[in-house]
Amino acid sequence: MKTFLAASLLAASAAIAAPAERPQDRWNLADLYPNVEAWNADAAKVDSAVSQLAACKGHLGDSAGKLRECLDLQSDVTKRYYRMAVYANETLAEDTGKPESLALTQRSQVLGSKLTQAASFVNPEVLAVGRAKIEQFLKDEKGLGIYRHDLEDILRTAPHTLDSEGEAIVASFGLARGQSGSIYNILSNADMPYPTIKLADGSEAKLDQSGYTKYREVANRDDRKKVFDAFWGEWKEFERTMGVSFYGMLKEDTVYTRVRKYPDTLTRKLDGNNIPPAVYDALIKATNDNLPTLHRYFKLRAKMLGVSEMRYYDIYPPLTGHGRDYPIDEGIQLMLDAVKPLGDDYVAAMKKGVESRWMDVYPRPHKLSGAHMAGSAYDVHPFLLINYNDNYESVSTIAHEWGHAMHTYFSNKAQPFPTAGYAIFVAEIASTCNEALLLDHMLKIAKDDDERLLYLGSALEELRGTFFRQAMFAEFERDVHARVDRGESLTGAQLTKIYGDILKRYHGDAQGVVKIDDLYAIEWAYIPHFYRSFYVFQYATSIAASQQFAQDILDKKPGALERYRKM
């Protein structure tokens, strides 16, 4: 079903001084609940509805009508719970240092665990009913059609499903899961004492996570080195702590892999979307085979920046000095203009979302950094968290996240709740397609070659970040999960060594392409996506499809837009 609940808790803080915020720059979570009291009232109702699921136990095979009745109940309770979870998670996202918001999120997690436990009998009972009878039920009761995919998934994964008692035990441990991600979130957001440095122009730069992403692009090379040394130096201080936390998550994954009788965690995680591990392995092999192309890009970048020895802190600055500010209103208009090829209704829906305050725009102290779209509140609308820095990367980011939002909006509009969700494997197509359309638009309106070079450089950097960098992350994940699956232990220092070796190989350190200081190998601890195991590879697999979709739409190939919108 929905795939965005965990994502909203997997980012970190931001504390860059933002432009003066206007009411329209803050999202309106009151669209979910007017206040916490209303949330509490709904929580009591959902809690009661969860208890009603027990009446279905032992009766799924009674008749097609009974099966539909029970699945309808489970679906309705899940839908209502997701709305509650989005409110709790995004309230915490506004200020992760606020104890009341953390408590609300924890209460949401308790209720979610209770729902999972209450429904734990469904899968083994469907298997006990048997494929033949389920197929007959689907023929007899047309209303079961919306559950066909879920039922087929249950039947497909039968070898990894326990009996009712076993599933209940596994479900009972759900409340204890995900703590490593929560530790990462609070430590990197609320507790880590991020440094402040003085730049060459005399200004001070607060290097929290959003500050790092902003100041790593500065033109002065000595300043960039200062930024990297200070930021990664702070993370290095927490290498032991982050190592224990991440190793805890790896062990948790391995335990569930064994319980579910999978050969390894990679296979288990991919099986959720019925993706064979060969796809993952092929991506990493293809990426490694094409590292010379990445190295050519780095050499070109070094030449354009005028540096004789490319360093890791030379990756992010723009290739030209054309950089200018893109205030949020201009960024939104550029995005709206760029997506016009997707249709008037698409643009209108996006504009409606902007005007209706679906988006939280600027960085604030204790606000989650990065960007995400929370789309699980089926009967409300998506919410977007952004940390807008008035640069072109920020414009590209809002185009990306609004791609997710529109995917969710139109999917929810066209389909009932049980079938409206979509796999991350295709989700990133909608987001990166918008980025491709934005690039095309910006190149068309660029005033001179320097401006065009800025956008082309950004596109190259996007390809590096979305394909090569995510594949590098995927290789690291495959390596460390496999080690723990084999029974090995891992410390923070060992994780840094493993990541550093991969980082240096991808960047051609041994060949002198990009020199990587050992300190920077602590970067693994900074990546929030690692707490969603085997997630990032899907960025790399999606970008090829999205580029083809975008080109076909721009070329107005017959049926191209219809095929894309159907997806």
Roles of regions detected by a PLM:
Residues 17-322, 332, 503:
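A well-structured
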Residues 397, 408-432:
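Post-HEXXH active-site segment of zinc metalloproteases
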Residues 2-16:
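Gram-negative bacterial Sec-dependent N-terminal signal peptides
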Residues 422-450, 459-465, 542:
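Post-HExxH zinc-binding segment in Zn-dependent metallohydrolases
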Residues 324-326, 359-381:
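Catalytic zinc-binding patch centered on the HExxH motif and its immediate surroundings
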Residues 19-21, 30-34, 122-130, 137, ...:
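C-terminal, non-catalytic "cap/extension" segments appended to globular domains
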Residues 326, 379-399:
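Short pre-active-site segment immediately N-terminal to the catalytic Zn-binding motif
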Residues 300, 304-341, 407, 460-466, ...:
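Long, K/E/R/D-enriched contiguous segments that form extended
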